[in-house]
Structures are given as structure tokens and as C-alpha cells.
Amino acid sequence: MSLDKRIESALVKALSPEALGESPPLLAAALPYGVFPGGARIRPTILVSVALACGDDCPAVTDAAAVALELMHCASLVHDDLPAFDNADIRRGKPSLHKAYNEPLAVLAGDSLLIRGFEVLADVGAVNPDRALKLISKLGQLSGARGGICAGQAWESESKVDLAAYHQAKTGALFIAATQMGAIAAGYEAEPWFDLGMRIGSAFQIADDLKDALMSAEAMGKPAGQDIANERPNAVKTMGIEGARKHLQDVLAGAIASIPSCPGEAKLAQMVQLYAHKIMDIPASAERG
């Protein structure tokens, strides 16, 4: 089974009618709406790739970790799109969840998705309780107020913002979770995998800042120009277009070198290199007027 199919199959199972039970019908429909069809599934792909590089001796735990991470990411997107935050009408080329349903249901759907992720991790405790506990702790740490994605969103309410701290929390946290949870799922220590996740996360955030400044809404599948509209801290505002491009290159240059020693190190390096090429695929100048 391909990596894509493995991840998608695990997500479908986690959000199946059998898994959701007797949920209110609209909420039961809203949960998969917020997850399918997916984007690139970058975070769970990195997680599973790291687990495979480390031996992937417990695939059920790896799959649960990948599902929990992607559900947390999707929940954050549902909440990001709400009028209280980005007020975005489009997500992944279709109406954002609060537009397709309503705002209260979108809040509940986002909450339910992140809770479902922790349920999936708790369930796999029957397979390997030690790893499940570590995964729950790691995902909680990198989702909350202590440098997790909640902290990243909260930085936007501060008058003075450290761009590096903001990027690490807003985007980097779940990429750090991807590399560290992949290692944990395969029985490896998490700490050596921090730097790789941090670099990949920083690169994606800088690239996202550049795309927000240069690309059209049609090309991105979501509203463009949101950083300026919402007065968010961003790399382009701080460094300029060319400065942000140079910083992106510098961040990516050290990503492969930061891969810890593991049995599948060479193959993992190829995957990181592939993502680096994709990340750098940004227009040279603005596509919109």
C-alpha cells in the first residue's frame, strides 16, 4: 500500500459512521467535510516517513499517530477560517466549514476533530501503552499554549512579536510533532528529531508568507493577501520578498543535514529533498494585480 493510501485509509476509518457513533447528523457530516478531500497531507506523510526510516515496528501505532496529527491540523484550519480569526470563505478550493454549515457548528467540528485524534491515540494504547502515552503527551505539548499551535494563534493578539517564536509555534509546532511522533511511534527517542521538524516547519511558514504575498486565491485554493489584511507578523513584512527567499533557502539548506542517524536515513533524505524543491516553487513576482 502506498503512503498516501495508508494515511487516507486510516483517516477514513477514524471518521467512519461506526467510529463516530450516534453523533448529531450535521456534526457527523461536518467532521469529514473538514478533512476530505485533503490537501497534501504533508504532516502525516512526514510522520509515517520518519517511522519507516526508524523501522516502523508497530504500524498500528504509526497510523494512529498520523491520524491524530492530521486531525489536529484540520481542526486548526477549521478554527483559523472562523470570522474571529481569518474570516476565510474558502479552504482547499471549497467553502470553508463555517460557510458550508454555520459558525457554531464549525467551532464544535474543530473541537470534535482534535478530540477524536486523542481518542485514536488512547485506543492504540491497547497495542503499545508506553508509546501511546508518549504520543498523547507530545501532541498535547505541541498543540497547546506552551509553544504549540494555540500559542502561535495567540501571538497574533500581541503588540510585539518575535517572528521566529511565532513561526515555530504557528506552523513549526506540528512539523516538530510530525518528526518527533514518527520517531516515538517506532520506539525511538523524540528529542533528536526536533531540529528537522523545526526546519521543515519554518520553511513551510516562510513559503506560505511568500505565497500569500505573491499568489492569487485561485492558485492557492484559499484567500490571498491575508497577512496584510489581518496585520499578521510575516517574513515578507519583516525581510522583504528577496530577504524572505534567501532566508527560506538558508533554512532548507540545513534540513537534510539535521536528519538523525537511523536505518532509513538515505531514503528519508530523498523525501526531504523532494519537499525542499516543492517548497521553493514560488512565483518570482506577484500573480495578482
From Swiss-Prot:
Enzyme class: transferase
EC number(s) given by UniProt: 2.5.1.29
Cofactor stoichiometry and binding remark: Binds 2 Mg(2+) ions per subunit.
Metabolic or biological pathway, per its Swiss-Prot or TrEMBL entry: Isoprenoid biosynthesis; geranylgeranyl diphosphate biosynthesis; geranylgeranyl diphosphate from farnesyl diphosphate and isopentenyl diphosphate: step 1/1
Keywords tagged on the record: Carotenoid biosynthesis, Chlorophyll biosynthesis, Isoprene biosynthesis, Magnesium, Metal-binding, Photosynthesis, Transferase
GO biological process: carotenoid biosynthetic process; chlorophyll biosynthetic process; geranylgeranyl diphosphate biosynthetic process; photosynthesis
One function term, GO molecular function aspect: geranylgeranyl diphosphate synthase activity
Superkingdom assignment: Bacteria
InterPro entries: Isoprenoid_synthase_dom_sf, Polyprenyl_synt, Polyprenyl_synt_CS
Catalyzed reactions: isopentenyl diphosphate + (2E,6E)-farnesyl diphosphate = (2E,6E,10E)-geranylgeranyl diphosphate + diphosphate
CC cofactor: Mg(2+)
One Pfam family from the record: polyprenyl_synt
Binding site for (2E,6E)-farnesyl diphosphate: 91, 170-171, 205
Function field: Catalyzes the condensation of farnesyl diphosphate (FPP) and isopentenyl diphosphate (IPP) to yield geranylgeranyl diphosphate (GGPP) needed for biosynthesis of carotenoids and diterpenes.
Family in the record: Belongs to the FPP/GGPP synthase family.
Identification of the protein by name: Geranylgeranyl diphosphate synthase
Protein's organism: Rhodobacter capsulatus (strain ATCC BAA-309 / NBRC 16581 / SB1003)
Lineage, highest ranks first: Bacteria, Pseudomonadati, Pseudomonadota, Alphaproteobacteria, Rhodobacterales
